[in-house]
Amino acid sequence: MDPNQKITILINSCDNYEDLWVPFFTLFKKYWDPKDVRILLNTESKDFSFNGLSIECIHPKNINDPYGARMLNALSHIRTPYVITLLDDFVLRNKVDQDLINRIIGWMDNDNRIAYFNCDYTKTFIDFEVNKYPGFKRIPNGNEYTLNMQAAVWRTKRLIHYWRPNVSPWEWECFTNLCAAKNKTDKFNRSVKFIL
């Protein structure tokens, strides 16, 4: 199966940041051509379109829902095993390495314990699987900010598992790592270079 049929791109935003959408999607279109990949824009109530991209806006049932509820609602619209998560201010500056994304999906297909590949650089004291995933390190559960809101390729079911309806992104980054520390089966991989 084509790796693009296994992923959805989820851009998380809010109505108040709609002024970021045109620059974000201008550079998105310039530096990435994710053929046949669903692109979802998670926001409260506004709709948005951009020439040359098929963007589906996802809105919560209640626009006053907390961020966590909005995130879970958006994730419920994803029908693929993997989701690439981005925030509206993660502006692309270079061409996205689609071959690397395809390799990541292959690695995740081959090891169900991998929860995600994060594109954030981290100083990891231990790499449990040296050179198994070139350009990435496996970081220990419970490491500070093991899970965070940086650009990442997530196993959709695991991302849903780690979210709670009443949390903000900042609370999620802090408190979810406590949950991750208890889960000894999930593997978390963080980049030593940026792909997005």
Task: Provide a role label for each language-model segment.
Residues 58-75, 82, 95-96, 101-104:
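A broadly used, surface-exposed interaction patch
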Residues 81-91:
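Short beta-strand-to-loop acidic/aromatic patch adjacent to the donor-nucleotide binding site
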Residues 95-125:
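Conserved donor-nucleotide/metal-binding helix-loop-beta segment in metal-dependent transferases, i.e.
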Residues 1-63, 75-77, 81-82:
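N-terminal anchoring/stem segment of glycosyltransferases
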Residues 40-41, 83-85, 115-120, 153, ...:
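A structural signal for short, well-ordered beta-strand segments and their strand-loop junctions
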Residues 146-196:
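Catalytic core and acceptor-binding pocket of nucleotide-sugar-dependent glycosyltransferases
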Residues 129-144:
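Short, flexible, basic/aromatic active-site loop/helix in glycosyltransferases
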